Curated annotation (Swiss-Prot):
Organism: Canis lupus familiaris
GO cellular component: alveolar lamellar body; extracellular space; multivesicular body
Location of this chain's protein in the cell: Secreted, Extracellular space, Surface film
Protein name, as recorded: Pulmonary surfactant-associated protein B
Residue ranges occupied by any Saposin A-type domain in the UniProt entry: 18-58
Short name of any one Pfam family annotated for the protein: SapB_1
InterPro entries per the UniProt record, alphabetical: SAP_A, SapB_1, SapB_2, Saposin-like, SaposinB_dom, Sphingo_Act-Surfact_Prot
Subunit relationships: Homodimer; disulfide-linked.
Residue ranges of every copy of the Saposin B-type domain listed in the record: 58-140, 184-261, 277-352
PROSITE patterns noted in UniProt: SAP_A, SAP_B
Primary localization class, coarse: secreted
Domain of life: Eukaryota
Other observations noted: Pulmonary surfactant consists of 90% lipid and 10% protein. There are 4 surfactant-associated proteins: 2 collagenous, carbohydrate-binding glycoproteins (SP-A and SP-D) and 2 small hydrophobic proteins (SP-B and SP-C).
Disulphides: 62-136, 65-130, 93-105, 188-257, 191-251, 215-226, 281-348, 284-342, 307-317
Length: 363
């Protein structure tokens, strides 16, 4: 599924809200290198690795990143993997609560799944991806590395077989004519639902461990730091791209859906595979991150809704929220980043190491 995960890189920076707020990143290296999450948000990972966290040579980082991308690409090009994803999505179409949507779901899947797969498999370029992450030096773009999607592709992805109302940018729910279906048919909701189901099935921890095994070049001071880096930032990127940008961009291309109902930060700094002793910090950062995108008035409701996330222990989350709600609300609306907020609450260690490894069980 890397051809979908890496869509933001191929589409250019204007296609999605990838970066952290510009004012925060404008603080410079002191802000960028506080954590891996912030380094990724500000596209300063290469700088932090070379200048702050270790003595990595730029060329080595670039090569290591490209190796990681190639491994993930190879994994996702396997026919058995694609068949598994296709069957999974077909099953999701079959179990939709509103059975009237099932035929349209299968139609959308059958028509556009192969189009998206074929295009992005042919467009994966490790060098471009690693430049976007700040791990390869920027240079003059080569003609075949244009990041903008071509007009012919857009023509293929605007659902020409469906009513004209679906072919223009507009509300995120569009209707078929009353003659075809007597109720509104939310194609964009359907698209996002299927992609979120894919998100839930991907074993991010297993992928991260596989990525960590390719580390053999980077000569950082601390032994094993490359494997740690590979494991940790792979999980972070998968969470970020699958959680927000993948639904936005794929559904935006296929259905021209608007981004009005997008919620949550571009980079959710919460891999579910963190070790048990970090669970309180993890929970706090997730809740705080979810609340950070809302107005002060909407923050309490956003904090409570965060506990409904499928991977959280709901009871522990609600207990945490009840215990910390007044102060959490004040800190979350004060413009601090999630980790700083949770340090202030005592949920996260103040001696946080940006390159602290995660512990993932081997399967």
């Amino acid at each position: 599924l890397l051809w979908l995960l890496l869509l933001p890189t191929l589409c250019g920076l204007g296609a999605a809200d990838w970066s952290a707020p510009s004012l925060a990143c404008a603080r410079g290296p002191a802000f960028w290198c506080q954590s891996l999450e912030q380094a990724l948000q500000c596209r300063a990972l290469g700088h932090c690795l070379q200048e702050v966290w270790g003595n990595a040579r730029a060329d080595d980082l670039c090569q290591e990143c490209q190796d990681i991308v190639r491994i993930l690409t190879k994994m996702t090009k396997e026919a058995i993997f694609q068949d598994m994803v296709r069957k999974f999505l077909e099953h999701e179409c079959d179990v939709l609560p509103l059975k009237l949507l099932t035929p349209q779901c299968h139609h959308m899947l059958g028509t556009y799944f192969p189009v998206v797969v074929d295009y992005f498999q042919s467009q994966i370029n490790p060098k471009i991806i690693c430049k976007h992450l700040g791990l390869c030096k920027p240079g003059l773009p080569e003609p075949e590395q244009e990041s903008e999607l071509s007009d012919p592709l857009l023509d293929k992805l605007i659902l020409p077989e469906l009513p004209g109302a679906l072919q223009v940018t507009g509300p995120h729910t569009q209707d078929l004519s009353e003659q075809q279906l007597p109720i509104p048919l939310p194609y964009c909701w359907l698209c996002r639902t299927l992609i979120k189901r894919i998100q839930a099935m991907i074993p991010k921890g297993v992928l991260a461990v596989t990525v960590g095994q390719v580390c053999h070049v980077v000569p950082l001071v601390v032994g094993g730091i490359c494997q740690c880096l590979g494991e940790r930032y792979t999980v972070l990127l998968l969470d970020a791209l699958l959680g927000r940008m993948l639904p936005q961009l794929v559904c935006g291309l296929v259905l021209r859906c608007s981004h009005e109902d997008s919620a949550g930060p571009a980079l959710a700094s919460l891999p579910s595979e963190w070790s048990p002793q970090e669970s309180k910090c993890q929970l706090c950062m997730f809740v705080t991150t979810q609340a950070g995108n809302h107005s002060e008035q909407a923050t309490p409701q956003a904090i409570r809704q965060a506990c409904l996330s499928s991977w959280l222990d709901r009871q522990k989350c609600e207990q945490f929220v009840e215990q910390h709600m007044p102060r959490l609300q004040t800190l979350a609306s004060g413009g601090r980043d999630a980790h700083t907020t949770c340090q202030a609450l005592g949920a996260c260690r103040t001696t946080f190491s940006p390159l602290q490894c995660i512990h993932i069980p081997h399967f």
